[in-house]
Amino acid sequence: MLTTMDSPLSDTAERGDPVGAWLSLPRRIYLDTSTLQKLYDFGGEIFEGEPFEPGGRAARVQGLAGEIDALRRIFMINERAMFEFVVTEASLREVVNRAHPRYTQWVYDVLDTWLIQSEGEQPPTPGRTFDDRHFGMISVKDSQLLQEALDWRCDAFMTMERRLPTAATFIERETGLRVMRPTTYCDLLRPFARLYY
């Protein structure tokens, strides 16, 4: 459990500005392929409230239960909060390359939701922020996804990966984009969850 001092919102909370804290929540969140895969694999647990009973490799993934529970809470809150979850062509290319037809169709359905939400927006001009050499520690694939998140004016980039969030502070400082795991986003939402239940 986070205390106010440990919370990512501690600056705002300490100033007694709950409205400012609420307004600072990421509302347009890019879903990377690792997050999409977990949403697909554990859809029953996340969307239907089924018990989390991982098998095989998933049973050995440290912290997976917490991340799946965080996704469940995020999407429960989103039933009323109406945050935007962004899926783009770069994500879709990665998914199609996995050659899993049912998963691919599911991601197309998620993409359709985003296309409806973003209807009327002009497609962004592709940026080149992540081409800069000081982002060299980020993989080419992650750089493409992060760039699309920036291009679509996302507030946050959600990933289940462990490596990319280690660069979160640097990425946010350089670009304003917040890279976070589901548990991090859930911690940001926690003070406001009752507004949406």
Feature map (PLM): residue ranges:
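Short, contiguous, well-structured surface segments enriched in hydrophobic/aromatic residues
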Residues: 97, 104-107
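Alpha-helix capping/helix-boundary segments
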Residues: 35, 91, 144-145, 163-164
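Acidic catalytic patch
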Residues: 90, 94, 109-136
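PIN/NYN-family metal-dependent endoribonuclease catalytic core
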Residues: 31, 36-100
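Short, flexible loop segments at the rims of nucleotide/cofactor-binding pockets, characterized by
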Residues: 6-8, 61-64, 132-138
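Acidic, PIN/NYN-like endoribonuclease modules and their adjacent C-terminal/linker elements
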Residues: 2-22, 43-53, 135, 146, ...
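Residues that mark the start of a beta-strand
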Residues: 26-29
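Acidic donor-binding loop at a coil-to-helix junction in glycosyltransferase catalytic cores
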Residues: 141
